[in-house]
C-alpha cells in the first residue's frame, strides 16, 4: 500500500484558543509548532511514502520542509476543504493517512499498527478520539472519499465507509485518544512518559505557571 500522509495545521494565530487563559499568543504558537514537529518526526520514521502539510503560515512551511514534507498553502481555512485540497494531489490508487498536527505522542509504531490492521486491501482504519472524534484516519483508496471531520466524526466516517462498502477497522490507542486543546490536556501531556518537543514545552509551562495552570484545571493537583 502506498500511503500519503496529510497533516492539516490551523493558522497559528488561531490555534489553541482554549489555552489563552494561561498561555499567551507566542506560547501557543510555539506549542503548535512543537506538536507539528513531533508529528512530522513520527511520520518520517513510518511507512508513509510522502508527507503533505497543509496550512497558511510561513513557520508551518519552514517546519514542514525541514522534515522533507511538501507544504501546500490552504486555500479554504476549513478543515475538510483543506483535506480535500491536499488529497487532490494524491494518486487515485494510493491511500491517505490524515494525522492532525496536535498529536504530540504519535509514534511511527502507531502508523505501522494502523496499516497492519487495514492490510493491503481497500478499507478504512481509524484511531478514535475520546470524545467521539477521529484522531487518525487511513483511507484506501482515497479517490472519491469525503472527509467528515468535526463533531461525532467517528460515526460519520464509519457511515461513509459502509456507504462505499469498505471494511472499517478501529484501533484504540489511549495515548492518541485526546488531542491537546485545553488546560487539562496540557497537564496530561506534561505528565505522560516520553520526551517529545511538545512535552518539554508543556513541562516548562507547568514549571513556570504551575499554580495558574492547576487553578484553571479540572484535574486534581499532583
Swiss-Prot record:
Keywords: GTP-binding, Nucleotide-binding, Nucleotidyltransferase, Transferase. The keyword Chaperone does not apply. One of its GO terms (biological process) is F420-0 metabolic process. It comes from the Bacteria. It catalyses: phosphoenolpyruvate + GTP + H(+) = enolpyruvoyl-2-diphospho-5'-guanosine + diphosphate. Its EC number is 2.7.7.105. Pathway: Cofactor biosynthesis; coenzyme F420 biosynthesis. GO terms for molecular function: GTP binding; phospholactate guanylyltransferase activity. Pfam families: CofC. Phosphoenolpyruvate binds at residues 134, 150, 153. NCBIfam families: F420_cofC (TIGR03552). Belongs to the CofC family. The exact nature of the substrate is currently not known. This entry has been annotated based on its similarity to Actinobacteria. Guanylyltransferase that catalyzes the activation of phosphoenolpyruvate (PEP) as enolpyruvoyl-2-diphospho-5'-guanosine, via the condensation of PEP with GTP. It is involved in the biosynthesis of coenzyme F420, a hydride carrier cofactor. This is Phosphoenolpyruvate guanylyltransferase. It comes from Roseiflexus sp. (strain RS-1). The lineage of its organism: Bacteria, Bacillati, Chloroflexota, Chloroflexia, Chloroflexales.
Amino acid at each position: 500500500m502506498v500511503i500519503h500522509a496529510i497533516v492539516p495545521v490551523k493558522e497559528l494565530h488561531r490555534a489553541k484558543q482554549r489555552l489563552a487563559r494561561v498561555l499567551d499568543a507566542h506560547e501557543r504558537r510555539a506549542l503548535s509548532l512543537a506538536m507539528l514537529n513531533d508529528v512530522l518526526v513520527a511520520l518520517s520514521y513510518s511507512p508513509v511514502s510522502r508527507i503533505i502539510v497543509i496550512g497558511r503560515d510561513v513557520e508551518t512551511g519552514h517546519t514542514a520542509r525541514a522534515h522533507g514534507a511538501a507544504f501546500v498553502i490552504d486555500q479554504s481555512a476549513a478543515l475538510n476543504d483543506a483535506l480535500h485540497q491536499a488529497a487532490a494531489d494524491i494518486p487515485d490508487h494510493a491511500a491517505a493517512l490524515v494525522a492532525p498536527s496536535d498529536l504530540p505522542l504519535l509514534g511511527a509504531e502507531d502508523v505501522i499498527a494502523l496499516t497492519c490492521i487495514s492490510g493491503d486491501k481497500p478499507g478504512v482504519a481509524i484511531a478514535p478520539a475520546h470524545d467521539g472524534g477521529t484522531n487518525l484516519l487511513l483511507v484506501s483508496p482515497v479517490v472519491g472519499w469525503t472527509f467528515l471531520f468535526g463533531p461525532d466524526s467517528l460515526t460519520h466516517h464509519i457511515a461513509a465507509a459502509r456507504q462505499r462498502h469498505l471494511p472499517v477497522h478501529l484501533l484504540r490507542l489511549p495515548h492518541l485518544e485526546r488531542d491537546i486543546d485545553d488546560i487539562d490536556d496540557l497537564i496530561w501531556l506534561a505528565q505522560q512518559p516520553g520526551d517529545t518537543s511538545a512535552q518539554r514545552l508543556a513541562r516548562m509551562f507547568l514549571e513556570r505557571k504551575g499554580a495558574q495552570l492547576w487553578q484553571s484545571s479540572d484535574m486534581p493537583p499532583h
